Amino acid sequence: MRINPGEIVKVLESKIEGFKEEINLEDVGKVIQVGDGIARAYGLNNVMANEMVEFVETGTIGVAFNLEEDNVGIIILGDYKGIKEGHTVRRLKKIMQVPVGEALLGRVVNPLGEPVDGLGPIEAKEFRDVEVKAPGVIYRKPVDTPLQTGIKIIDALIPIGRGQRELIIGDRQTGKTAIAIDTIINQKGKGVYCVYVAIGQKASAVARLVSKLKEAGAMEYTTVVVASAADNAALQYIAPYAGCAMGEYFLYNGKDALVIYDDLSKHAVAYRQLSLLLRRPPGREAYPGDVFYLHSRLLERAARLDEKYGGGSLTALPIIETQANDISAYIPTNVISITDGQIYLEPSLFYAGQRPAVNIGLSVSRVGGAAQIKAMKKVAGSLKLDLAQYQELETFAQFATELDPATQAQITRGQRLMELMKQEQYAPMEVEEQVAVLYAGINGYLDDLEVEKVRLFEKKLIEFLKDKKSEILNKIREEKDLSEETEKMLKEAIEEFKSEFVKVYGK
């Protein structure tokens, strides 16, 4: 066999001509320590704060959280068990984004926007940064449209407007999540898209909640973001920002959205865990110094945009769990000072059967009053006064043996109004029904009934108005006011109904 040098030269020449010079420059580092959802890496000299990085061997994503002189502290978004010392980390040159848009409606996702409901992949056309700057004063307009929760005591006394931040605060098992879920259910047909963010909750509780929303037909306009108790602290920390970004898609497209953060106490605990593991200096209650900013930058993203900028709104309902009724602890006081009011739920009221267990004295809405419809304003004004007087007299009446008729009348009215404030879970009411029922309460139509019959009276009155006097409810809904004519019709209808009710059920 003879070797032909000419052929070898030809082959070499063709190979050299076809060679493309490619230099792949990547900023990489090496893992020097890993554990508890945190990794430290050497190298990555040009990485930016909050930039995403990838652990090459496992494909796991992390976020550069601490930039120190000789290493980078990374929070790991996912399972860190496969990551080992000496593994390579590379920069992704982008900050964290999540899929947004209508493709996420009806889905249950994790904080990275990946589906966890087994219904296949999500075809999102758009992505949004998880951390963005809140809209400035110039882009906003005052809150002027109501967000109806369907809960009488809230819509009448602590009204919420679209674009408001209203805190729901109370001990464990006092019905905080129930208020949030009823609010979501009540948005059906009202053009409000909802995002429910579960932070550090039991997966079984979230599954139960999702099935309730499906039953009520509310998942059609709702996205559920879950960072359960089984997920690591990094995912729990990211969750509310991811949920907010999903809600902001609707805000900046001129639509209305509602985001519920359940709950921010566990969020603060997750952030404290990350900060302590990264050796950031602890402050009060071992929380880091910037824990106020942690929540303020999240809640400031809720807004009502001016018409020039689309006129969308993002309403936030953060939830805080207190320990033994202590609303003066660090995180509760922080969030109270950030939000535009709070709904305070009290265990003693809850166990006494007053549900929703809202303490009217400690609850307040700082901007929602401007958003109330005129009809509700008319009935809520005297309702507030009647209940305040009743609560004042109630304590006094326990010690007094004989009461003058005026005091006795106020106590009688107050007891019936408090009974009227009770409401079943998963049964939100339309605002026109609330107006009719409260009108009957404040005008003394319940005063001569037994307290036990108040709820029955309410139920039958709504049925009567829907069946026989639907034009009254329609007028209140359309005019959003209680004109003299409508009021006269409502008065006559209640009187007619009451005489029938007393005949059948007695007083």
Swiss-Prot record:
Signal peptide residue numbers: none
Top EC class, one word: translocase
Instruction: Give the source's domain of life in one word.
Output: Bacteria
The answer to whether keyword Cell inner membrane applies is: yes
User: Which SUPFAM superfamilies does this one have?
Assistant: C-terminal domain of alpha and beta subunits of F1 ATP synthase (SSF47917), N-terminal domain of alpha and beta subunits of F1 ATP synthase (SSF50615), P-loop containing nucleoside triphosphate hydrolases (SSF52540)
* The UniProt record lists the keyword Transcription regulation: no
Output the Gene Ontology terms for molecular function: ADP binding; ATP binding; proton-transporting ATP synthase activity, rotational mechanism
Reaction catalysed by this chain?
A: ATP + H2O + 4 H(+)(in) = ADP + phosphate + 5 H(+)(out)
Provide GO CC annotations from the record.
Answer: plasma membrane; proton-transporting ATP synthase complex
Q: So where does ATP get bound?
A: G170, D171, R172, Q173, T174, G175, K176, T177
Q: Which UniProt keywords apply?
A: ATP synthesis, ATP-binding, Cell inner membrane, Cell membrane, CF(1), Hydrogen ion transport, Ion transport, Membrane, Nucleotide-binding, Translocase, Transport
HAMAP family in the record = ATP_synth_alpha_bact
Function (record text): Produces ATP from ADP in the presence of a proton gradient across the membrane. The alpha chain is a regulatory subunit.
Q: How does it assemble?
A: F-type ATPases have 2 components, CF(1) - the catalytic core - and CF(0) - the membrane proton channel. CF(1) has five subunits: alpha(3), beta(3), gamma(1), delta(1), epsilon(1). CF(0) has three main subunits: a(1), b(2) and c(9-12). The alpha and beta chains form an alternating ring which encloses part of the gamma chain. CF(1) is attached to CF(0) by a central stalk formed by the gamma and epsilon chains, while a peripheral stalk is formed by the delta and b chains.
Name of the protein this chain belongs to: ATP synthase subunit alpha
In its UniProt entry, the species of origin is given as: Thermosipho africanus (strain TCF52B)
